[in-house]
A protein has these predicted regions:
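Acidic, glycine-rich loop-and-strand cores that form catalytic or ligand-binding grooves
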Residues: 201-216
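Boundary at the C-terminal end of the N-terminal hydrophobic targeting segment
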Residues: 19-21
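Serine-hydrolase catalytic machinery in alpha/beta-hydrolase-like enzymes
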Residues: 24-134, 144-147, 151
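Conserved alpha/beta-hydrolase "acid-adjacent" motif
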Residues: 190-194, 198-205
């Protein structure tokens, strides 16, 4: 009976352990990486990349979406990178996704290569399930999620775009299908539900974005 109580107490302790967060330099400075307490290098684990909106940061995005707080419950690895800071003006952080959003100053920034480098590095250091690599992006991060998935459909299994949008230009279908969830408020005045433009560069609406990917 004492042994039973000891094992039960040990299991309860292990299950209540918090996820572990560490910083890793993926080439542009340190980035928070959350590792669930139940991570086992012998088992494949899903990976989520959380992409912030224009002017925000990875840590700030996670602070109100709370992905790191549920990493243990759903057993996934989480990376919350921060984009490039503008060199003048607002000096806001951004992802170079499409012509509409949101690279207004630094045309040479290659966020596709940077983010894919993060995914590849994570695969080298952890046992990542290659069939469960996901992107979650808010606003500008949603734009970036669409673009990363389009350019790397063999790697990205699914994306969630929160008030983001896909590309407005006509393109061939990506090589592989990608699951898409678009969440968008109809009263959004920044990235409009029905679509619009930013500094003269068009972006599709929420319905058009998901219809585009459904046709792919």
């Amino acid at each position: 009976m004492k042994r039973y109580h000891f094992v039960t107490a040990l299991l309860c302790t292990l299950l209540s352990l918090p996820s572990f967060s560490q910083n890793t330099d993926f080439g542009r400075g340190e980035v928070p990486v959350t590792i669930p307490s139940g991570y086992n290098s012998a088992e494949e684990t899903p990976l989520i990349i959380l992409l912030h909106g224009y002017g925000s940061t990875g840590e700030r995005q996670d602070s109100y979406l709370g992905f790191s707080r549920i990493a243990n419950k759903y057993n996934f690895l989480l990376v919350t990178p921060t984009g490039t800071r503008e060199s003048s003006g607002r000096q806001a952080t951004f992802w170079n996704a499409t012509s509409a959003c949101c690279n207004f100053q630094e045309p040479s920034i290659d966020d596709n290569a940077y983010l894919m480098g993060i995914i590849e590095r994570m695969k080298e250091e952890y046992n990542i399930d290659s069939n469960r690599v996901y992107l979650v992006g808010h606003s500008n991060g949603g734009f970036m999620s669409y673009q990363l998935a389009y350019n790397n459909s063999e790697t990205i299994a699914a994306i969630v775009s929160l008030a983001g949008a896909s590309h407005a230009d006509k393109r061939e279908s990506p090589e592989h299908a990608v699951h898409v969830l678009q969440i968008h408020g109809t009263d959004d005045s920044t990235i409009r539900y029905e679509g619009g433009d930013i500094q003269g560069n068009d972006y599709p609406g929420a319905n058009e974005s998901v219809s585009q990917w459904a046709e792919y």
